Amino acid sequence: MKISITAPAKINLSLDALYKRDDGYHEVEMVMTTIDLADRLYLERLDEDKIVLDVKAHFIPEDRRNLIYQAALLLKKRFDVKMGVRITIDKHIPVSAGLAGGSSDAAAALKGLNIIWELGLSIEELAEISSEIGSDIAFCVYGGTALATGRGEKISALPNMPGCWIVLAKPSISVSTPTIYKELQVESVEHPDTKKMIESIKNGDLDGIFASTGNVLESVTLEKNPQVKRIKDRMLAFGAEAALMSGSGPTVFALIKQYSRAKRVYNGLRGFCEEVYMVRPWSEGENDTNK
């Protein structure tokens, strides 16, 4: 059996860290949505008991360091699967960008393996299993727009993000998420209004969504990397209605109602930043798993 499955990137419309927990993680409230910048996974069931990864990108491991490999290994051990799999990944999501590319690939792998290994697991079961690999993966299993709490693994679905244009820009730097969280001072940063963001999404209120964006991690990443702030400022100068860093960075995204203005922001960033994308929100109903 062979199938293919889409693995969309995500952005954080709001990201709040409330306090540091006893287990070392931060208690978070994040409103996230998937976008139509996506990787594509191709899965082939093998009779031989082995996991084979083929990543069409440089600098990405094809062994146990890869979240896809970890997802496959977890399912094999949990359900005593004797079959194998070959997974080919066509990468489009930037690496180490704050867009959950690795987590989305792992989520897509879990969903694809559930099909080709005929495990019969529900989405809820896959999301629960995914939390053993990484905090962001549960959201990526569901896709669409949702509130994530706990350390990011508790997911509450929200209505789809209203239609708009999203311009992404990733500078050629890498950011360490653990380092950013370690240096975050939750008592001294401005916290986003998560309730207002949720209310605006439920009402389909784009202006309310734009006004409610916020990310507590910006205070750390922008201080360490001034180029991230320059990208954000440039987006706003070219007409973005909102601009925000996604995750721990370094990618910044702009939210814009009109195509013409979005194109202006996009053109204003090309040449200023190496990786620039113009995309739309993506909902779970668009997930085309093909056998």
Curated annotation (Swiss-Prot):
Belongs to the GHMP kinase family. IspE subfamily. Pathway: Isoprenoid biosynthesis; isopentenyl diphosphate biosynthesis via DXP pathway; isopentenyl diphosphate from 1-deoxy-D-xylulose 5-phosphate: step 3/6. This is 4-diphosphocytidyl-2-C-methyl-D-erythritol kinase. InterPro entries: GHMP_kinase_C_dom, GHMP_kinase_C_sf, GHMP_kinase_N_dom, IspE, Ribosomal_Su5_D2-typ_SF, Ribsml_uS5_D2-typ_fold_subgr. It comes from the Bacteria. GO terms for molecular function: 4-(cytidine 5'-diphospho)-2-C-methyl-D-erythritol kinase activity; ATP binding. Keywords: ATP-binding, Isoprene biosynthesis, Kinase, Nucleotide-binding, Transferase. HAMAP family: IspE. Its EC number is 2.7.1.148. The active site is at 10, 136.
